[in-house]
């Protein structure tokens, strides 16, 4: 497969989470891009944390892909998500979902779901994006996450 054709089969997910208070009402947002097609998604919960919403954004973005994709590029401003998936998860799985300090992994249910969603696709790349720094898609994902949070506050 050529580099050009693999790029055409790639999906970009721009994700963000937002929370008022920690814990408190929170929301997640995703901008999904496949070629020239875009989709925006968001949701929220009445009592959650910022880390749960950051994880949920990635999970929901991947879950929205109804077929396996050869290349998914995930753009997140969450170092928690980025380090969790690229540095910590292998050890957590090896240790039965315990940290190196033998404590249960926080948000293990979401990490397991993320691991499962990642397994449905080919290559997944992770890119950290500085939050609130004018990155257009990250700003859109942030607005969606805030919308989800605001709607959760009202319910």
UniProtKB/Swiss-Prot annotation:
It is found in: Cytoplasm. The keyword Phosphoprotein does not apply. GO terms for cellular component: cytoplasm. One of its GO terms (biological process) is DNA replication, removal of RNA primer. Binds 1 Mg(2+) ion per subunit. May bind a second metal ion at a regulatory site, or after substrate binding. Its EC number is 3.1.26.4. GO terms for molecular function: magnesium ion binding; nucleic acid binding; RNA-DNA hybrid ribonuclease activity. It catalyses: Endonucleolytic cleavage to 5'-phosphomonoester. Its main location: cytoplasm. Mg(2+) 2 binds at residues 16, 142. Its cofactor is Mg(2+). Mg(2+) 1 binds at residues 16, 54, 77. Residues 7-150 form the RNase H type-1 domain. Keywords: Cytoplasm, Endonuclease, Hydrolase, Magnesium, Metal-binding, Nuclease. It is an enzyme of class 3 (hydrolase). The keyword Magnesium applies. It comes from the Bacteria. Endonuclease that specifically degrades the RNA of RNA-DNA hybrids. Monomer. Belongs to the RNase H family. This is Ribonuclease H.
């Amino acid at each position: 497969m050529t580099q050009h054709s693999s790029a055409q089969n790639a999906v970009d997910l721009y994700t963000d989470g937002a929370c008022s208070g920690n814990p408190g009402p929170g929301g997640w947002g995703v901008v999904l891009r496949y070629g020239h097609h875009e989709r925006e998604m968001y949701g929220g919960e009445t009592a959650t944390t910022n880390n749960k919403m950051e994880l949920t954004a990635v999970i929901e973005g991947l879950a929205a892909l109804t077929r396996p994709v050869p290349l998914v590029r995930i753009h997140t401003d969450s170092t928690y998500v980025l380090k969790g998936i690229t540095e910590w998860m292998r050890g957590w799985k090896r240790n039965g979902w315990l940290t190196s300090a033998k404590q249960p992994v926080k948000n293990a249910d979401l990490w397991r779901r993320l691991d499962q969603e990642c397994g449905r696709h080919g290559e997944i790349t992770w890119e950290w994006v500085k939050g609130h720094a004018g990155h257009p898609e990250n700003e859109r994902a942030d607005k969606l996450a805030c919308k989800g949070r605001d709607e959760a506050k009202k319910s």
